Amino acid sequence: MAKDMTLLWGSGSPPCWRVMIVLEEKNLQAYNSKLLSFEKGEHKSAEVMSMNPRGQLPSFKHGSKVLNESYAACMYLESQFKSQGNKLIPDCPAEQAMMYQRMFEGLTLAQKMADVIYYSWKVPEAERHDSAVKRNKENLSTELKLWEEYLQKTSGSFVAGKSFSLADVSVFPGVAYLFRFGLTEERYPQLTAYYNSLKERPSIKASWPPTWLESPQGQDMLKDV
């Protein structure tokens, strides 16, 4: 079963991490795992391009089926192995609706986070503007306050109800990334409590980015958000 699965991934990538968390939650740890280096450009290798012509990670293969979008891979795994491991989509219609809502809202959070963190990496120096940096940080702050409210309503343990779900699989890696880049704990107490609670979950600990373990000290880019 898991031996028919291959995951090409990069350390610290939230999309890669999502798939790894689901594989852990569904007791599919025997999959073929291949860690590639973004720094060395290995995500553009022939092996990756043959599975994902976009040259992006993750790239997940189960038998002859290839899924290169992390949300798609996560939903596929839960669908195919519904009765194995931990259930990640609740049966209750109201909880399921909330799970899907928060899951896909996580994409907005990820985009606003990327607008800040990757701005200086993606925008040529001659085209950068302080006003854009300020605006992006303000947009991220507004988004984070929304998630603070969400977590307050759910008592902070999970983003979409009483149990760990695909919504948490989708959102947690991004939250961890935010704190890795210096998000202030005092300013976002609900997100801090959520992060500190879920980082101890076995599936998350088992898939923690190895580069983060090697270099626990992150950056302070988000200290003023």
From Swiss-Prot:
Pfam families: GST_C_3, GST_N_2. Residues 3-85 form the GST N-terminal domain. It comes from Pleuronectes platessa (European plaice). Found in all the tissues examined. Highest values found in liver and in intestinal mucosa. This is Glutathione S-transferase A. Induction: By epoxides and by antioxidants. GO terms for cellular component: mitochondrion. Keywords: Cytoplasm, Transferase. Belongs to the GST superfamily. Theta family. Conjugation of reduced glutathione to a wide number of exogenous and endogenous hydrophobic electrophiles.
